[in-house]
C-alpha cells in the first residue's frame, strides 16, 4: 500500500501566508519560506502553495517565493491560484514547482487540463475542486468558493481525470477553516470513482480528523493549514499518531 501523505497548505497573499474561514476573514500566519522550511524539517511529504491574490503582479511575487522555497526544501511543491494558461504553469514550474494546481480556469477551459498534461506530464497537473453540499450532492464553486457553476463535484472530478489530471485536490467549502473535521462522505464519493489520488482538504482540527479522512474518507493524502501554522500540532506528532493507528506513513529518522 502506498504511504498516506500529510501536506501543509500555505495560502499566500501579498507574499505572506494567511488563513481564513471559508475563504474569508484572513489573518497573517507568517513568512512562506520560513514556514515551508519548518514543515520540511518536521517531515511534511509535500507542500501546497495557493496564491489567493493571484493578480499579475502577485504572480511574479509567487514565482519568487517558489524559487526561494525550492532552494530550502527538497520535497514536492505544488503551486496554484489564478493559473489560466500554459505560460502561467511554465513560469511556476521553471521557478521550482513540481506540480501546478488549476481550479477556476479548468472549469471555464477544461482543455487546459489536457494541454498541461500533454506538455508537462499528467503527474504535474492537479485539479483543485471546491465543493459545497447541496442536498444529497455537491456543487462545484469557483472564484475562491464564491461562484456556483452548476457542475456536480463527483462528475467534474471524473471528467478532470479523463482530461489528464494526475490528482484531485478536493476542498469542502462547508468544512473549510472550521476545524471540525473533513467532509468524508464527499471524499469517499469522489475517491471511489477515480483511479488517481484524492487529496482531502478543508476542516482539519486534530490528528484524529486527518486519520478519519484517510481511513473513513479513503483519501490518499490530507491537506491542512491552521492546525500546523499556529503550532497546535507538529507534522511529526500527527504522523506518529497516524502510524500508531496503523496507517502507512513516512516517518523521519
From Swiss-Prot:
GO cellular component, as recorded: cytoplasm
Catalytic function, reaction form: 5-[(5-phospho-1-deoxy-D-ribulos-1-ylimino)methylamino]-1-(5-phospho-beta-D-ribosyl)imidazole-4-carboxamide + L-glutamine = D-erythro-1-(imidazol-4-yl)glycerol 3-phosphate + 5-amino-1-(5-phospho-beta-D-ribosyl)imidazole-4-carboxamide + L-glutamate + H(+)
CDD domains named in the record: HisF (cd04731)
Organism: Dehalococcoides mccartyi (strain CBDB1)
Record's protein name: Imidazole glycerol phosphate synthase subunit HisF
GO biological processes: L-histidine biosynthetic process
Subunit-level organization: Heterodimer of HisH and HisF.
Predominant localisation class: cytoplasm
